[in-house]
Regions:
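A short helix-coil junction within the Rossmann-fold of NAD(P)-dependent oxidoreductases
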Residues: 9, 36-52
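Substrate-binding pocket helix/loop in short-chain dehydrogenase/reductase
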Residues: 10-11, 18-23
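Active-site loop immediately N-terminal to the catalytic Tyr-X3-Lys motif
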Residues: 12, 65-71
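Active-site helix of classical SDR
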Residues: 34, 76
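Alpha-helical segment proximal to the catalytic Tyr-Lys
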Residues: 39, 89-92
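Residue(s) in the substrate-gating loop at a strand-loop-helix junction
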Residues: 60
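C-terminal helical subdomain
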Residues: 100-101, 108, 120-165
Length: 165
């Protein structure tokens, strides 16, 4: 369950439309996808050959921290973590495992949606650090969902080796 935008900048004087866009995509989008998938996952866990099903939500390392200039983004990612844990507790006895992947810097277009001055700030912060690739996140998801049915890996925090926070 992965959809998101990262529109960074100070809270004071921020375009509220950017906040609404992040909340709509990062939170509401994830909620609606989970809601649509859950009946199918519950059925698969009950009737499928593995007797377990997996819902994996993608958050961010930003769901564990808070930084100046990313307050609303942090809010959306913290919310994904809280939702995932609540849902996990709600459906765990029905053999649907809920996992949360929290990636650090990944080489995607995510930062490119920001205003030019913010893109420059992101570039300075991460410099020439080698970012992860999408396949690194896919490997983490694969690990999570291929555990035996009696094992639930509920969270994976994954960062580039050089990423400080």
């Amino acid at each position: 369950n992965n959809a998101g935008v990262m529109l960074l900048g100070p809270i004071v004087g921020a375009p509220v439309e950017e906040w609404e866009r992040m909340i709509d995509i990062n939170v509401r989008g994830l909620l609606h996808c989970a809601h649509a998938a859950l009946p199918h996952l519950l059925e698969a866990a009950e009737q499928g050959p593995r007797n377990v099903a997996d819902l994996v939500n993608i958050s961010s390392v930003a769901g564990r921290t808070a930084n100046s200039g990313s307050g609303v983004y942090n809010l959306t990612k913290h919310g994904i973590g809280a939702f995932s844990e609540s849902l996990r507790q709600e459906i765990t006895r029905r053999h649907v495992r809920v996992g949360l992947i929290e990636p650090g810097a990944v080489a995607t277009e995510l930062a490119g949606h920001n205003r030019p001055e913010i893109r420059e700030m992101i570039g300075q912060r991460f410099g020439d650090m080698q970012r992860m690739e999408s396949v690194d996140i896919a490997d983490a998801i694969l690990y999570m969902v291929t555990r035996p049915g009696h094992v639930a890996v509920n969270e994976i925090l994954i960062r580039p080796t050089e990423q400080e926070r």
